[in-house]
């Protein structure tokens, strides 16, 4: 199966944060029947994603958990951060880290972001180059 990576480019007109877009994408992907790992740069970012998912309208509830949380049943969306990740199988990786996670090879689909900030944009370009060199099929989409 071909490995694909989709980069979402936040344009100057975009009013959403990367975290908001990641939550919306995770919800949509889960509704299509896939299990998602959102890999955050920090625990603080993971907690922000967790809170955003809990704040959604009750009719749009998205079952999720933070890595390491005890749950009776596995949830379809896991939120992890550097150094903290369960080993449960997931279909798609939403990468919010500054680098490509070392476990990315276990996925066939990655979603990543190109923020507006120049330093973060440079890091995103490096991730794009890395994935291209590893043979991933890459695509981009403007947001905003």
UniProtKB/Swiss-Prot annotation:
Catalytic activity reported: DNA(n) + a 2'-deoxyribonucleoside 5'-triphosphate = DNA(n+1) + diphosphate
Gene3D superfamilies linked: DNA polymerase III subunit chi
Record-linked InterPro entries: DNA_pol3_chi, PolIII_chi_sf
Key words, A-Z: DNA replication, DNA-directed DNA polymerase, Nucleotidyltransferase, Transferase
EC identifiers of the protein: 2.7.7.7
Keyword Transferase: yes
Gene Ontology annotations of biological process type: DNA replication; positive regulation of DNA-templated DNA replication initiation
An annotated Gene Ontology molecular function: DNA-directed DNA polymerase activity
Top EC category: transferase
Subunit comment: DNA polymerase III contains a core (composed of alpha, epsilon and theta chains) that associates with a tau subunit. This core dimerizes to form the POLIII' complex. PolIII' associates with the gamma complex (composed of gamma, delta, delta', psi and chi chains) and with the beta chain to form the complete DNA polymerase III complex. Interacts directly with the psi subunit (holD). The only subunit of the DNA polymerase III holoenzyme known to interact with single-stranded DNA binding protein (SSB), interacts directly with DNA helicase YoaA.
Similarity field: Belongs to the DNA polymerase III chi/HolC chain family.
General function of this protein: Part of the beta sliding clamp loading complex, which hydrolyzes ATP to load the beta clamp onto primed DNA to form the DNA replication pre-initiation complex. DNA polymerase III is a complex, multichain enzyme responsible for most of the replicative synthesis in bacteria. This DNA polymerase also exhibits 3' to 5' exonuclease activity. This subunit may stabilize YoaA and/or stimulate the helicase activity of YoaA.
Protein's recorded name: DNA polymerase III subunit chi
Species of origin: Haemophilus influenzae (strain ATCC 51907 / DSM 11121 / KW20 / Rd)
Source species taxonomy: Bacteria, Pseudomonadati, Pseudomonadota, Gammaproteobacteria, Pasteurellales
Gene behind this protein: holC
